[in-house]
Amino acid sequence: MDTESKNKKTTNGGENSNCSHSTRTPDKSIEERFYNWERRSRTTNRFGTTVNSRSYNMYFQGTHNTSRRHTYGNIHHRRRFSDNIRRCLRQLCMKRKTPAKKRSDKLVSRPSLPEHVFTLARIKNVTTFIFNVTSELHYSHIDLKEMPIYAGSGSYGVVKIFKKTDIAVKKVLECFKTELLMTLIAGECALRAKSTLRINNIIPLLAFSIPSKELVFPAYHMDMDSYYHRLARIDKTVQHWKAIEKTFMDLGKAVVFLNVSCGLTHLDIKCGNIFVNVTEGPNPILVDAVIGDFSLALLNTNSTILKSRFDVNISSDKIQSLKVCRGNIKPVFDLVLGHGQTQPCELMIKALNGVGFERRSTPLTSDEGVSIDMYALGQSLMEVILAAGMNFTHRFGISSNPLHFYYHRLMRADYLLDILAYRCMLYQHLFPMTPLTSKNGIPWERAEKIRLQLHSSRHRAEFDKYLEAYDITHRKLFDSLNIFPYLNNLLELAALYCHANPVARTADLLLWN
């Protein structure tokens, strides 16, 4: 018998129909506990009326048969007995409830790092899980006794820094729930990475506000983009490059952990989304770095929460649910390709051939996620090397890719062919041939291999024209590059991350041995 029919029959029975508890079916576990406790303790109630144990069961099931009602005695005893049951049930419920940790609706200080971002509440079925988000993470509004400093803005929203409190608050303008969901998952991954593998290179989530559409993170000194521009203007030592090498190796471990262990592919790794802390002084050295901004992240095939729901306790009587939807799983090719500056060449070839992900309904595999994210991380490392490391011999920095604004920031075929030709010309002068980089083939992109993969004869002809143009304009420049010894390890790492063979990009032998 369903709950509605139970409640209906109990109310129609005429017992305390005006009481708010009369239409409520007790929880089964409470029913069993109360029934066993009453049977063990006594057979008569405090009014001296003998109670049949089967009458308890009939009350809980809501089946009040007319012939059996007389076992309770007169109606006066029935009402007092029903009140006694409800009183005992209230006591059991009070004992069962654990006192909730008090939390303030205002954010008045820097939140501490939580033990868990969310915990498993129940399993709905084999593939669907219900999680409870830690209630202490949510706040209604900020009430800090300081004025924030504007840090930046864009299509994503606005970021402000509270220096005294040492937090960064990101106000999301569009698609807040999607970014919140991915940030919650990434925040839990950050805690797992720190506790299991001591990886501290995923930005942790400190708090969030659904009414204000805000995310709270630890504050960092700057992003990697600002750091390498600053690095290009100072006197660098070997310690600077060793710190950069260690930082990008740790970031590589974090990327592999996100894709393989957490089933989360970032899809937007770049210098602007890597946040760093540096030492004080005129020649700052990298101390640590984290990967942030999971607004474009997707769950891949290694994820175990593809059909999950996350419940956020906003107030005592309001719960906001965040569900993993199709947009968090299915890759959209245009979003994966992005602006093309940090994406691997195989994605550009797919775009030129018109293949993409149009007929694909499954998530990205973890191997695809690793190859995309590691290549983007390698492109970020290449920007640092070329802008801050190669300006010893040249007064200007060498670009790692053709400039996007020349093509009005549109993903046109000539722009993609330009990138492919430029990488074929540049990387053969930078990437070293070592036992690590050559284990899975030649590390740089080769023109003859790309030419064979292009389906259109027009694209092949335009690709050859770009190669000829770069041979005229950039050959002497690239031949004159002088690679300093302290850059060899960094270039080897970049060659692995940006390897022409996607299998080599995990850099297993280098990162985990």
From Swiss-Prot:
Question: Which segments carry the region annotation Disordered?
Answer: 1-27
Entry's localization field: Virion tegument; Host nucleus
Which stretches are tagged as biased composition: Polar residues?
10-23
Recorded catalytic activity of this chain's protein: L-seryl-[protein] + ATP = O-phospho-L-seryl-[protein] + ADP + H(+); L-threonyl-[protein] + ATP = O-phospho-L-threonyl-[protein] + ADP + H(+)
**Top-rank taxon:** Viruses
Modification after translation is described as: Autophosphorylated.
Query: Which InterPro entries does UniProt cross-reference here?
Result: Kinase-like_dom_sf (IPR011009), Prot_kinase_dom (IPR000719), Ser/Thr_kinase_AS (IPR008271)
GO CC field: host cell nucleus; viral tegument
Active-site residues per Swiss-Prot or TrEMBL entry: D268
The entry lists its GO molecular-function terms as: ATP binding; protein serine kinase activity; protein serine/threonine kinase activity
- Binding sites annotated in the UniProt record for ATP: A151, G152, S153, G154, S155, Y156, G157, V158, V159, K170
Q: Which UniProt keywords apply?
A: ATP-binding, Host nucleus, Kinase, Nucleotide-binding, Serine/threonine-protein kinase, Transferase, Virion, Virion tegument
Q: What is its EC number?
A: 2.7.11.1
Which ranges carry the Protein kinase domain?
145-487
Write down the Pfam families for this protein, in alphabetical order. Pkinase
Q: What is the purpose of this protein?
A: Multifunctional serine/threonine kinase that plays a role in several processes including egress of virus particles from the nucleus, modulation of the actin cytoskeleton and regulation of viral and cellular gene expression.
Q: Which family does it belong to?
A: Belongs to the protein kinase superfamily. Ser/Thr protein kinase family.
Task: Kindly provide the name given to this protein in its UniProt entry.
Answer: Serine/threonine-protein kinase UL13 homolog
* Species assigned in the record: Gallid herpesvirus 2 (strain Chicken/Md5/ATCC VR-987)
